[in-house]
UniProtKB/Swiss-Prot annotation:
A Gene Ontology term for the protein's cellular component: extracellular exosome
SUPFAM superfamilies referenced in this protein's UniProt entry, alphabetically: NAD(P)-linked oxidoreductase
Family that this chain belongs to: Belongs to the aldo/keto reductase family.
Active site: 55 (proton donor)
PTM info: The N-terminus is blocked.
Protein known as: Aldo-keto reductase family 1 member C4
Cellular localization per UniProt: Cytoplasm, Cytosol
EC class (word): oxidoreductase
Tissue expression pattern: Liver specific.
Biological source species: Homo sapiens
Disulfide-bonded cysteines: none
Site, as annotated: Important for substrate specificity: 54
Length: 323
């Protein structure tokens, strides 16, 4: 089997490609760019495509996937597509309609994976960040166990092959896992993860529960002012990462991606640059030594780029716990 189609078995028996293509772009990037880059990614060999309601690009990403199916490049079952339920749709009665709305935009019959995007419910409705007259985000109180039950129904209905969570801490994962009458465990927890925030404790916990850790922001984010402090350290300029890149004749990005794969983490590579999209798929063509891995482990400083500080007051804000 072509190494670039390596997959990991999920706890529900489905398989997820270990390298994914992240489609998020800041609002100023024209939406139709998502069509081009998703097609490029599929042509380069990516089979795992990650999007979300919040990214506001599912029509474009769906169009790209369908056009690569139509031209015979791939079959639908070759593609592993992830979408995410946004926090304003966590009221149980809103979950399935939100997924159906995503499917309608995508013009697909099912998603391979549907995630709770963040563990924080916000005021219901179409506005992603509903604010009061003082500009403060309006929270909602929802029992996420009840939201999860409807996620399970979406899986049973065949609208989502697998269901999981994103940006949950250990305590929040346990809450779902210990839920009375749990039918399906989350197959994964997609979290920020890179050499500066290697999530080793959360990774160990997830492995112990047969939950896959999926790394977003694996290259240190796009550093967009909406989400990230402009003074934050630039991961891909890290001297240790650059020295390893030189040693292996690879890019620093490839070292950061390879690091995750060798730890058993599924990794998302986000790029809207054609050359880098093609480069990133080369992550399967080299290996890091155990010494290299130790050196990379040593870069951890529990540094989080995506802090979401405007939600810090939320009772379910996930990043105050150690992991």
């Amino acid at each position: 089997m072509d190494p670039k189609y390596q997959r990991v078995e999920l706890n529900d028996g489905h398989f997820m490609p270990v390298l994914g293509f992240g489609t998020y772009a800041p609002p100023e990037v024209p939406r139709n760019r998502a069509v081009e880059v998703t097609k490029l990614a599929i042509e380069a060999g990516f089979r795992h495509i990650d999007s979300a309601y919040l990214y506001n690009n599912e029509e474009q990403v769906g169009l790209a996937i369908r056009s690569k199916i139509a031209d015979g490049s791939v079959k639908r079952e070759d593609i592993f597509y992830t979408s995410k339920l946004w926090c304003t749709f966590f009221q149980p009665q809103m979950v399935q309609p939100a997924l159906e709305s995503s499917l309608k935009k995508l013009q697909l019959d099912y998603v391979d994976l549907y995630l709770l995007h963040f563990p924080m419910a916000l005021k219901p409705g179409e506005t992603p960040l509903p604010k009061d007259e003082n500009g403060k985000v309006i929270f909602d109180t929802v029992d996420l166990s009840a939201t999860w039950e409807v996620m399970e129904k979406c899986k049973d209905a065949g609208l989502a092959k697998s269901i999981g969570v994103s940006n949950f801490n250990c305590r929040q994962l346990e809450m779902i896992l210990n839920k009375p009458g749990l039918k399906y465990k989350p197959v994964c927890n997609q979290v920020e993860c890179h050499p500066y925030l290697n999530q080793s404790k959360l990774l160990d916990f997830c492995k112990s529960k047969d939950i896959v850790l999926v790394a977003h922001s694996a290259l240190g984010t796009q550093r967009h002012k909406l989400w990230v402090d402009p003074n934050s350290p630039v991961l891909l300029e890290d001297p240790v990462l650059c020295a390893l890149a030189k040693k292996h004749k690879q890019t620093p990005a490839l070292i950061a991606l390879r690091y995750q794969l060798q730890r058993g983490v599924v990794v998302l590579a986000k790029s809207y640059n054609e050359q880098r999209i093609r480069e990133n798929i080369q992550v399967f063509e080299f290996q890091l030594t155990s010494e290299d891995m130790k050196v990379l482990d040593g870069l951890n400083r529990n540094y989080r780029y995506v802090v979401m500080d405007f939600l810090m007051d939320h009772p379910d804000y996930p990043f105050s716990d150690e992991y």
